């Protein structure tokens, strides 16, 4: 027969247990709050069309592998669809918005009327810019050139940006502006999206080309005032894999990132979007990002 304890003893145990659990819950909430308060800048670099196995462990990507070992690697991060543009749109709006193939230029009627991350960022009084390498002019959306494609510039696909010439041209700018903007933390946008050109993003060129480009620019970003004087986060990921293999490398770096850390937890573009929203206390854009696991485990 189970042993019965006096009601007073049970009540005392409940009080003790509550006293033990409440501080733990508060500590967990405090940890997330502290992280949200201390991430000032978020930089996202999106490379192209390579599986994780083509990057991690590859002799063609020595810089990326060294960066992953030094900082953090999401070893089970996957694109959502084998369509780069779909993943770009999902990463910035919480849905592929019905775009399941490559559609360019956005001026051909492909833009969608969807609330997006740029809207949330501006509403929170933060700043943002997308730096596109080899873009012919600020806000250019008319079509592909030898090295540039608007299909790698997701914010051009939102009608509230595409149809607003001033907003488009002031936020979607040539990559050559980045060194000037990054000279001071105060002039570095809070949210930065970097789209390398087709030679450097690995889409139409060997992995080694992209690795060399990142080796040139990532150290400059990490050594910039935004990263040395304020807590900032850099994420390097890929838009999609190849065929049925949609596992892509995703590397996190910066002073707020754990060192020598690898996670086997499954993540996707909605996870990265939800992480940004959580860090900056932005409202989720859809149920997709609202329900996605955050990547806060990579932060320290």
Predicted regions and their residues:
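Flexible, surface-exposed loop/gating regions in the mature catalytic domains
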Residues: 29-300
């Amino acid at each position: 027969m189970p042993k019965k304890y006096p009601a007073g003893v049970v009540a005392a145990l409940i009080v003790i247990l509550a006293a033990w659990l409440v501080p733990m819950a508060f500590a967990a909430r405090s940890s997330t709050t502290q992280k949200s308060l201390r991430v000032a800048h978020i930089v996202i670099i999106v490379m192209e069309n390579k599986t994780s196995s083509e990057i991690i462990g590859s002799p063609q990507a020595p810089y990326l592998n060294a960066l992953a070992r030094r900082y953090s690697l999401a070893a089970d991060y996957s694109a959502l669809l084998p369509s780069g543009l779909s993943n770009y749109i999902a990463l910035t709006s919480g849905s592929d918005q019905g775009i399941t193939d490559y559609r360019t230029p956005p001026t051909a009627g492909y833009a969608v009327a969807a609330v997006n991350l740029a809207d949330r960022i501006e509403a929170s009084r933060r700043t943002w810019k997308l730096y596109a390498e080899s873009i012919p002019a600020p806000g250019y959306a008319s079509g592909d050139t030898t090295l540039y494609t608007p299909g790698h510039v997701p914010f051009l696909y939102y009608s509230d940006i595409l149809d607003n010439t001033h907003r488009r041209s002031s936020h979607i700018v040539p990559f050559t502006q980045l060194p000037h903007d990054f000279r001071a933390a105060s002039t570095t946008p809070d949210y930065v999206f970097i789209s390398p050109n087709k030679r450097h993003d690995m889409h139409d060129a060997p992995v080694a080309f992209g690795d060399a480009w990142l080796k040139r620019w990532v150290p400059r970003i990490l050594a910039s005032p935004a990263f040395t004087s304020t807590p900032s986060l850099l994420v390097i990921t890929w838009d999609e894999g190849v065929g049925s293999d949609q596992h892509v490398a995703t590397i996190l770096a910066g002073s707020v990132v754990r060192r020598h850390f690898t996670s086997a937890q499954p993540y996707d573009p909605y996870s990265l979007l939800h992480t940004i929203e959580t860090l900056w206390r932005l409202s989720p854009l859809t149920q997709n990002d609202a329900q996605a696991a955050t990547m806060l485990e990579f932060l320290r």
